[in-house]
Amino acid sequence: MTFIPATAEELTAEWVDDAMRSVGVLHGDDHVRGIRVAHLSYGGVGLSGDTVRVHLDGEGAGLPETLIAKFPTAVVANRGMIEGFDGYAREIAFYRDLALQVPVRVPGHYGSAMDPARFAGATDVAAKVVNRLPSRAHLALTADITKFMRPTKRRYVLLIEDMGADTVVHDLEEPPSVEQLCQVAGCLAGLHASFWGRQDLADHPATRTLVTEIPRVFVNVLRGRCRPMAEDRWSSWLTDADRRRLDASTDRFAADLGVINEPHTYVHGDPRSDNILFGAGDPIMLDWAMSSVGHPGYDIGYLLGSSLRRDDKG
């Protein structure tokens, strides 16, 4: 398939049919004759991309009524950031190679396509260059880091099973119950256990360590941008103890990064409640763009830190 749709508007019935057939979802007399694209009830436009529901017209026993299509975000800085750690390609690689291996519920892979990377080692080279910069250059770089997050012209599209029927997404303002979070923690533990010590994951495109080889930049961004932003947004309820914790976590961030990157097992990387579908049975884990080899404690800490209700923290 030489043509790759770059946006939902470019999707065609012919392309969807070919994509689904290429991964064995459609067979023989199964055919997609027409499509209708609709936005999801909860928006579908997030930090990293545009997600839509595609209604399928056609015939055949293997033809589902709908599927989900994912595309990169149109926001330049956001896309540059996601491509900085190869997030779009990382998620496609997960669905192509690992989705059937993980012991957690995930949508089925209905097809995908992306342009080849022009230089797969670009982020590694960038990390080496940045690490050699003097401190003053680091500060200048991080003063407005977004202007350096330039996206590529690569096209990415991912088609997955629509599992939205009879499921609920809990956003971060209305997080799930403690019982539901315990379910997710159990699923993550199963994921971590099943991949524990797998040496073959180190160089897989879905599991490579995230671009965290430049901790000085991250620390400067935290100090120069994130910490003041937190003060501006939440100063009315931040206590002195909160501020001390923020400062301490910033100071030790580089060391924490080293622990997070310890290659123990496969981690989801972004298990917030709004990346999980809740319904009958086990939770369904979505959004694998930040998956990597790392420390399992990161997944659990991220889940509880982002999704545990304030009243349940203690």
Each language-model region and where it sits:
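ATP-dependent phospho-/nucleotidyl transfer catalytic cores
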Residues: 2-4, 145-151, 157, 166-268, ...
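A conserved long alpha-helix in the C-terminal portion of kinase-like catalytic domains
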Residues: 244, 283, 292, 307-314
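Short alpha-helix boundary/capping segments
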Residues: 80-87, 173-183, 292-295, 311-312
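Short small-residue beta-strand/loop micro-motif enriched in glycine and branched aliphatics
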Residues: 77-79, 167-171, 285-286
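Active-site acidic catalytic loop and adjacent metal/ATP-binding pocket
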Residues: 44-58, 68, 250-298
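Conserved NTP-binding catalytic cores of kinases and kinase-like/nucleotidyltransferase enzymes
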Residues: 1-155, 279-283
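Active-site activation/catalytic loop segments of kinase-like enzymes and analogous catalytic loops
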Residues: 93, 97, 297-314
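Conserved protein kinase catalytic core
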Residues: 76, 167-168, 276, 293
